């Protein structure tokens, strides 16, 4: 089935301009959404705890800042843009008591809805607008008159017009300038988690560390191993980002291209693919979500232990020393 894409002509900005919006959170995505909504003529306020260090920044940016509860009470569209592990308690304590029939609850990621951490009441629209880029890029592109592609989904259309509202919101942050891709909360959440775990954050990191360790154990200098297995990764990824894997292979030497074709499949074997399928299954059946929630409910002991161990890896120490020589990284 062909992807369903929507653009500026498919969205009516007047719809979101007629709503009262609360953006909960002012991190990477929160600041981009709030500022772009404001610049699109939307009545927006930012919901942050009194103790939040981001309050001063949001106020400096000219936004009205209130507590999350006050924001939820004032608004009829609430966009939650705080870390996933905060959603459950934030929703129960600050947002749910102020939801009314006809309100809309929006998300930048589908985790809490997909795994039942939040169960919105009847009569409330539930939708997602998720830019496929970091907040600073979303904001920069908006200011330049362009946009970053967004994923848009509607989980519950209580009003009968939730889809139009979601597209209007996407237009207000520049998403429909580039294109809004229709998806579902299930698809966005499961593919996002799998991509992070098996490829982007987990898979690539472990591949780099394994390559580095293989060279060092064979007697090569750690500094040279770092250059070959980590530092040059950016060069390769940038080529893929610009033109896909084919452009990367077109750009590297024939030697590198042949080596990639013939040796790459020996690294990513059928056994590796089977583990990928297991990881996906754990995402799909809720095993991972249950593990994550339990870990954070306990105060993140294993998470913090692994973070500390990661920071002590030899590759991190070598990288710190080598990056100090790279003047272009200091700007």
Swiss-Prot record:
Protein known as: Ketol-acid reductoisomerase (NADP(+))
Lineage, opening ranks: Bacteria, Bacillati, Actinomycetota, Actinomycetes, Streptosporangiales
Sorted UniProt keywords: Amino-acid biosynthesis, Branched-chain amino acid biosynthesis, Magnesium, Metal-binding, NADP, Oxidoreductase
UniProt similarity note: Belongs to the ketol-acid reductoisomerase family.
Residues reported in the UniProt entry to bind substrate: 253
Residues reported to bind Mg(2+) 1: 192, 196
One Pfam family cited in the UniProt record for this chain: KARI_C
Cofactor note: Binds 2 magnesium ions per subunit.
UniProt cross-references to PANTHER family, sorted A to Z: KETOL-ACID REDUCTOISOMERASE, MITOCHONDRIAL
GO cellular component entries: cytosol
Residue sites binding NADP(+) per the record: 26-29, 52, 54, 135
UniProt-listed Enzyme Commission number(s): 1.1.1.86
Pathway membership: Amino-acid biosynthesis; L-isoleucine biosynthesis; L-isoleucine from 2-oxobutanoate: step 2/4; Amino-acid biosynthesis; L-valine biosynthesis; L-valine from pyruvate: step 2/4
Superkingdom of origin: Bacteria
List of residues binding Mg(2+) 2: 192, 228, 232
KARI N-terminal Rossmann domain location: 3-183
Residue positions of the active site: 109
SUPFAM superfamilies (UniProt xref): 6-phosphogluconate dehydrogenase C-terminal domain-like, NAD(P)-binding Rossmann-fold domains
GO BP terms: isoleucine biosynthetic process; L-valine biosynthetic process
Catalytic activity, reaction form: (2R)-2,3-dihydroxy-3-methylbutanoate + NADP(+) = (2S)-2-acetolactate + NADPH + H(+); (2R,3R)-2,3-dihydroxy-3-methylpentanoate + NADP(+) = (S)-2-ethyl-2-hydroxy-3-oxobutanoate + NADPH + H(+)
Alphabetical list of InterPro entries matching this protein: 6-PGluconate_DH-like_C_sf, KARI, KARI_C, KARI_N, KARI_prok, NAD(P)-bd_dom_sf
Domain KARI C-terminal knotted, residue spans: 184-329
GO molecular function: ketol-acid reductoisomerase activity; magnesium ion binding; NADP binding
Reported function: Involved in the biosynthesis of branched-chain amino acids (BCAA). Catalyzes an alkyl-migration followed by a ketol-acid reduction of (S)-2-acetolactate (S2AL) to yield (R)-2,3-dihydroxy-isovalerate. In the isomerase reaction, S2AL is rearranged via a Mg-dependent methyl migration to produce 3-hydroxy-3-methyl-2-ketobutyrate (HMKB). In the reductase reaction, this 2-ketoacid undergoes a metal-dependent reduction by NADPH to yield (R)-2,3-dihydroxy-isovalerate.
């Amino acid at each position: 089935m062909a992807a369903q894409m929507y653009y500026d002509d498919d969205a009516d900005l007047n719809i979101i301009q007629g709503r009262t919006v609360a953006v909960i959170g002012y991190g990477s995505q929160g600041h981009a959404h709030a500022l772009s909504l404001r610049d699109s003529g939307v009545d927006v306020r930012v919901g942050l705890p009194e103790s939040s260090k981001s309050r001063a920044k949001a106020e400096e940016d000219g936004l009205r800042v209130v507590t999350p509860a006050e924001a939820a009470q004032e608004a009829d569209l609430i966009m939650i843009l705080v870390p996933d592990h905060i959603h459950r308690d934030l929703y129960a304590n600050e947002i749910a008591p102020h939801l009314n029939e006809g309100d809309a609850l929006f998300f930048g990621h589908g985790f809490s809805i997909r795994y039942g951490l939040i169960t919105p009441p009847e009569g409330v629209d539930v939708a997602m607008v998720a830019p496929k880029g970091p907040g600073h890029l979303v904001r920069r592109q908006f200011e330049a008159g362009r946009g970053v592609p967004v994923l848009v989904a509607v989980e519950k259309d209580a009003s009968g017009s939730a889809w139009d509202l979601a597209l209007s919101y996407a237009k207000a942050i520049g998403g429909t300038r580039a294109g809004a891709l229709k998806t579902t909360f299930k698809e966005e959440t499961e593919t996002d988690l799998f991509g992070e775990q098996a490829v982007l954050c987990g898979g690539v990191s472990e591949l780099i560390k394994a390559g580095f360790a293989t060279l060092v154990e064979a007697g090569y200098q750690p500094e040279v191993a770092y250059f070959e297995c980590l530092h040059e990764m950016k060069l390769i990824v940038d080529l893929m980002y610009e033109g896909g894997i084919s452009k990367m292979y077109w750009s590297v030497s024939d030697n590198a291209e042949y080596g990639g074709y013939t040796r790459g499949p020996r690294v990513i074997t059928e056994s590796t693919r089977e583990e990928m399928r297991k990881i996906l299954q754990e995402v799909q059946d809720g095993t991972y979500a249950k593990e994550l929630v339990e870990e954070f409910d306990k105060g993140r002991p294993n998470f913090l232990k692994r973070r500390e161990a990661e920071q002590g890896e030899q590759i991190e120490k070598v990288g710190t020393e080598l990056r100090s020589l790279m003047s272009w990284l200091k700007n």
